[in-house]
Amino acid sequence: IADMQREGLIRHVGLSEVSVEQIKIAQQYFTVASVQNRYNLVDRFSEDVLDYCESQNIAFIPWFPLAAGSLANEGSVLDEVAKRLGAAPAQVALAWVLKRSSVMLPIPGTSKVKHLEENVAAASIVLSDEDFAALDAAGKAEWNKTQA
């Protein structure tokens, strides 16, 4: 891969489902343009990878970025923020992902035009620092439950 990149046959190299250590090893051989790991409001397994990508200015592409687990339930923090903003919970979950890091590049999958339109509109949702922190805390608490 490194030789092909040097020869111009490959312009950019991305990695998927890797650890920080694996990224560092890859960086010894070629420039890493992006990392695609599972990450969302409640799945924080790749938190350290995202932080490392941010420090290295590597694009981070979260797969399954809309997952919110029980946070999407009626009366949850996510539900309350969504209602207050006049948005769908999935839009707020996506807005949280977008605000989380400047290197974040979510590409949520969808099979319906309505959901595509909602996903695009999520980019214009502005979360206050308080809403972001409340969602972050709720997501971490949910994540911690799954790790116990």
Give the role of each language-model region:
Residues 1-148:
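Beta/alpha (TIM)-barrel catalytic core signal, keyed to glycine-rich beta->alpha loops juxtaposed to Asp/Glu
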